[in-house]
């Protein structure tokens, strides 16, 4: 494993490489997390944007969607627990961009918590 891959939080090396191959000048990868459920393949966080792989197309087609932090209006943790319960008990987040909401589900609440906090940092 190369030094860059060791320093970036990621679930799958091939997803990290896919994000790294499309970086802009001066852009760095923060984390790449594998998603579960239908539609989303992974989410990447960089110093400039959120990158989501959308696998909801027919056949073997997929899209890579780049969302600049400046276009994100809000980010939410999706939970079936009350505020009095465990707030980050779920592994899902919702990212609102205009009238569209991207929902991403993870294996583990810590990943959702990290993604939420990184996005919140860049949109605040």
Describe the function of each predicted region:
Residues 1-44, 107-109, 114, 121-124:
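Anionic N-terminal interaction surfaces
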Residues 32-42, 46-92, 96:
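Phosphoinositide-binding peripheral membrane targeting modules
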Residues 78-81, 120-124:
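Short secondary-structure transition/capping segments
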Residues 94-113:
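Canonical phosphoinositide-binding patch of PH/PH-like domains
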């Amino acid at each position: 494993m190369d030094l860059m891959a060791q320093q970036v939080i990621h679930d799958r090396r091939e997803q990290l490489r896919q994000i790294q191959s499309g970086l802009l000048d001066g852009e760095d990868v923060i984390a790449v997390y594998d998603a579960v459920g239908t539609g989303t393949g992974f989410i990447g966080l960089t110093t400039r944007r959120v990158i989501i792989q959308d696998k909801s197309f027919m056949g073997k087609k997929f899209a890579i969607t780049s969302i600049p932090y400046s276009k994100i209006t809000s980010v939410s943790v999706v939970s079936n627990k009350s505020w009095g319960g465990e707030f980050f008990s779920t592994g899902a987040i919702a990212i609102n961009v205009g009238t569209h909401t991207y929902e991403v589900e993870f294996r583990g609440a810590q990943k959702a918590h990290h993604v939420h906090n990184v996005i919140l940092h860049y949109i605040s």
